[in-house]
């Protein structure tokens, strides 16, 4: 929130006792009849969420603050959202993908297309399903944009604070919001600013995930006008500095090192009666669903969804606009030349001219659908074909015309508009409309592409070509559908229609195909035909089904699918920096999301060397979003099953499974060091991580999967939990990394009770005890260990040291540790290392190296500077057949300090030097 004023002392802090209709139930809660007489199923999502059904608000009455608004007759929208709307939607269910997450309690519609993996939920309905329901979208099918876990709201205890530059700060209960203010009920189309973003990602990857063309929905919203609430609280005049109204939600989010979701609008907007801004508590005649902001959210018609804060807890009137992390680092359209590095370096995020508020004009072709086939025969050519779609604009502007072209814009057909919405008394149009046009089938037969564009009442229209921007927002270029000739049946021809993309990680779309061709053409001149580049020989026209890919899931044949391409990575198993397990964990699967989460652009370019063909999507039997697969003939690894509890006593029963683990304790050991304890799914389980291996911690951060490797510090036989020691890299502390560590800041922001997913074991090194290692599947014995660690790279060394010392006196392995850090305060696990070195002087010798001494008066007795040849010669043994060097730390340290100096010390760098 903007920090221009301090919150004022509340004059009305205690929840009030505004009268609410209804009798007391047996459990003491208020009992209410169903809203609008609509019966609710026993499994309704409204049940069990800590709130009663709502009655319709009392009859409208003039505001008590002297408002001179002209009262208008409100329309009755019940026929649009009556019982027939609910009956057309299948019952919500608890999705297996939510199991083990903070959203496990929420029931959701199973047809929603998930765009960001398991958690948090970001989804859109299938485009055909969205259009089937017409003007009003059932709440269960409304698109969802969540930044984190859904707060568990309770109607009876929820309050909204209104504070800042107001004369009468208040804390309003939900009953007061419903009964104390006149209700307004209007239909409003909500659109995510990222709608159609996947088209931009096909040109160049943005920082956002893959929205398709269904990030748009329309509901009838009921609530209290924001202006009435602000007037009741006595908003101060603009001359007194009351220029902005900030909203803050209830979620605990990782952005900015931990924050709520917040944003703001101007005072002028907030008080403008023509804008119909409300604090909504009902959607389509029902209380809000949890995903849509229960119990109360902001609705700002004509604006992007990102301004409409859900789960509203605070409204603060301020001088400056919100200073919330998400107000600046989200919902911006930056110039096309600005990439992430430039945006951070030159503070483009904070330039006010690039903020998005009102929607732009947009339109989409929904009929013909993607992969729809139109047979060409004597019957179809005698009648027209009706194309259909939707269109919308922002700021209350009405769509005035929609046009379709079959010849690349040379000529245009004017479409018939269906405008179900009447203008408001101020002449505003807050909803989408639909269009249709009948074309001759023979004209379609001669077309290679069809495109649509819309115009609004200000004569704004859509550009022909896509305009890329870093966040991939406000994409509104012509929506183009390719037309191709096919043979659906023997002896018959037809037309197959191809949309530009498919949402999320679903394969298909002409833009993906076009990008693949461009990539191949660009790569071809520099590639040689050889067995290491098999796609040069076999890609042309080669296609595989997912069932074929699943057969290749072992060391003998390891195939993966990434973005619809099939890759044979068998030849790369021995060369992968993370070991063969890093590939085998995903062999035989579509690992698009996980590959993107942990690989650089260089690695992505290298992957194309191993492309052998394209994936055939075979319908409902396949999902590219890390779906649950059935059994296959794997020799080493089991198939992926997301979030399935492993049988006791080992939690990590398969390196492919994501295991949900709950944060049960968090200790702050220093300013930037945290010790986390995560409970395993069952209290009698051990983690099952061999010494030397690591796990992946997986989380969805800012809508994208993030995965990082960590080695627990707890003992391998610890029952019921494991511990992670994490150094938090905060933003704005290192000039080369202004955003800090994405995962470490996320973990630091997690509240106790939250869940993460872990996968493993992973890694190419395992210590089996008494000097015996297994490295890349081959046994190796060592009597002496040279251990060089930097920063948090101490954790795998710590596991090996711990294992050796627990097996005394049998394990006679000698360990020589050189541990580098910036200062003495950055040394992790120092107390344990010093204690062990003192207790076992014949087994463990420790030498610290730091860049600078912060407290010279304490008498620092170890090294200062860098890890040099001199340091290594003095503190680790010479190379030899019985000596093994283990290293873990920043890549520059390994490359420039460790590797060249160990080579000078006669280490066999191919067989006796291991980097974790």
UniProtKB/Swiss-Prot annotation:
**Which residues are listed for heme binding in this entry?**
576, 599
Q: Where does FAD bind?
A: 708-711, 725-730, 737, 742-744, 792, 795
A single GO molecular function term of this UniProt record: molybdopterin cofactor binding
What positions does the entry give for Mo-molybdopterin binding?
A: 192
An example of a Gene Ontology BP annotation on this entry? nitrate assimilation
**GO cellular component annotations, sorted alphabetically?**
organelle membrane
**Residue intervals of the FAD-binding FR-type domain:** 656-768
Relate the assembly described in the record: Homodimer.
This chain's protein is named Nitrate reductase [NADH] 1
């Amino acid at each position: 929130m903007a920090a221009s004023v301090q919150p004022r002392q509340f004059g009305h802090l205690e929840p009030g006792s505004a009268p609410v209709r209804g009798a007391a139930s047996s459990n003491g809660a208020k009992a209410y009849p169903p809203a609008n007489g609509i019966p609710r199923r026993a499994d309704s999502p409204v049940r069990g969420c800590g709130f009663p059904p709502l009655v319709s608000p009392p009859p409208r009455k003039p505001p008590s603050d002297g408002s001179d608004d002209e009262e208008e007759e409100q329309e009755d929208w019940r026929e649009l959202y009556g019982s027939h709307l609910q009956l057309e939607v299948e019952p919500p269910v608890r999705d297996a993908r939510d199991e083990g997450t903070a959203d496990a309690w929420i029931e959701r519609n199973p047809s929603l297309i998930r765009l960001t993996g398991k958690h948090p939920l970001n989804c859109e309905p299938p485009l055909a399903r969205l259009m089937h329901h017409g003007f009003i979208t059932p709440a269960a099918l409304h698109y969802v944009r969540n930044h984190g876990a859904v707060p568990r709201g309770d109607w009876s205890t929820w309050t909204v604070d209104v504070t800042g530059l107001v004369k009468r700060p208040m804390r309003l209960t939900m009953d007061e919001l419903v009964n104390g203010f006149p209700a307004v009920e209007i239909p409003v189309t909500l659109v995510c600013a990222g709608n159609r973003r996947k088209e931009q990602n096909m040109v160049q990857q943005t920082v956002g995930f893959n929205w398709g063309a269904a990030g748009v929905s329309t509901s009838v919203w009921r609530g209290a006008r924001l202006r009435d609430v602000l007037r009741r609280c006595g908003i101060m005049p603009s001359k007194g500095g009351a220029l902005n109204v900030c909203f803050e939600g209830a979620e605990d989010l990782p952005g900015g090192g931990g924050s709520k979701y917040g944003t703001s609008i101007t005072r002028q907007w907030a008080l403008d009666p023509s804008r119909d801004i409300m604090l909504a508590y009902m959607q389509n005649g029902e209380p809000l669903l949890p995903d849509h902001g229960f119990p109360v959210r902001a609705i700002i018609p004509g604006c992007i969804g990102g301004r409409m804060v859900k789960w509203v807890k605070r409204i603060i009137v301020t001088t400056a606009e919100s200073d919330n992390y998400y107000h600046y680092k989200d919902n911006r359209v930056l110039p096309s030349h600005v990439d992430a590095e430039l945006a951070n370096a030159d503070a483009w995020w904070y330039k006010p001219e690039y903020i998005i508020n009102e929607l732009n004009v947009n339109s989409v072709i929904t009929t013909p659908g993607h992969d729809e086939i139109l047979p060409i025969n004597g019957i179809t050519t005698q009648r027209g074909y009706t194309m259909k779609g939707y269109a919308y604009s922002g700021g209350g502007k009405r769509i005035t015309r929609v046009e379709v072209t079959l010849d690349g814009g040379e000529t245009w057909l004017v479409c018939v508009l269906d405008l179900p919405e009447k203008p408001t008394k101020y002449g505003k149009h807050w909803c989408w409309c639909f269009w249709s046009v009948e074309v001759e089938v023979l004209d379609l037969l001669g077309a290679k592409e069809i495109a649509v564009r819309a115009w609004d009442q200000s004569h704004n229209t859509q550009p022909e070509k896509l305009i890329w921007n870093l966040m991939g927002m406000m994409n509104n270029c012509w929506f183009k559908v390719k037309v191709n000739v096919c043979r659906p049946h023997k002896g018959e021809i037809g037309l197959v229609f191809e949309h530009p993309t498919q949402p999320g990680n679903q394969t298909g779309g002409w833009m993906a195909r076009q990008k693949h061709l461009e990539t191949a053409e660009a790569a071809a001149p520099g590639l040689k035909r050889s067995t290491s580049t098999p796609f040069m020989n076999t890609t042309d026209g080669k296609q595989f089904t997912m069932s074929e890919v699943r057969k290749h899931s072992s060391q003998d044949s390891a195939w993966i699918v990434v973005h619809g391409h099939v890759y044979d990575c068998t030849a790369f198993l021995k060369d992968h920096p993370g070991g063969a397990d890093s590939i085998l964990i995903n062999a035989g699967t579509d690992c698009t999301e996980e590959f993107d989460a942990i690989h650089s652009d260089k690695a992505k370019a290298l992957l194309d060397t191993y492309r052998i063909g394209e994936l055939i999507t075979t319908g409902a039997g396949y999902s590219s979003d890390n779906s649950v697969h059935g059994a296959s003939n794997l020799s080493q690894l089991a198939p992926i099953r997301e979030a399935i509890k492993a049988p006791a006593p080992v939690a990590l029963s398969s390196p492919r499974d994501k295991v949900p683990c709950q944060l049960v304790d968090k200790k702050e050991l220093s300013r930037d060091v945290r010790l986390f304890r995560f409970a395993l799914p069952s209290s009698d389980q051990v983690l099952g991580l061999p010494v030397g291996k690591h796990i992946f911690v997986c989380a969805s951060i800012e809508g994208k999967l993030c995965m990082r490797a960590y080695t627990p510090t707890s003992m391998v036989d610890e029952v019921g939990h494991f511990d992670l020691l994490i150094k938090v890299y905060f933003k704005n502390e290192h000039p080369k990394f202004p955003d800090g560590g994405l995962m470490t800041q996320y973990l630091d922001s997690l509240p106790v009770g939250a869940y993460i997913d872990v996968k493993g074991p992973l890694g190419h090194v395992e210590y089996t005890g008494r000097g015996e290692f297994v490295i890349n599947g081959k046994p190796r014995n060592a009597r002496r260990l040279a251990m060089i660690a930097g920063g948090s790279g101490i954790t795998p060394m710590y596991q090996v040291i711990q294992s050796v010392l627990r097996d005394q006196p049998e394990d006679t392995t000698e360990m020589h540790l050189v541990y580098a850090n910036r200062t003495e305060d950055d040394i992790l696990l120092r107390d344990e290392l010093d204690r062990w070195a003192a207790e076992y002087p014949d087994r463990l010798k420790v030498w610290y190296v730091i860049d600078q001494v912060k407290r010279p008066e304490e008498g620092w007795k170890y090294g200062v500077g860098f890890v040099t040849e001199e340091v290594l010669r003095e503190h680790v043994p010479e190379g030899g057949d019985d000596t093994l060097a283990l290293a873990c730390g920043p890549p520059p340290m390994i490359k420039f300090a460790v590797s060249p100096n160990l080579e000078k010390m006669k280490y066999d760098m191919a067989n006796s030097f291991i980097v974790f």
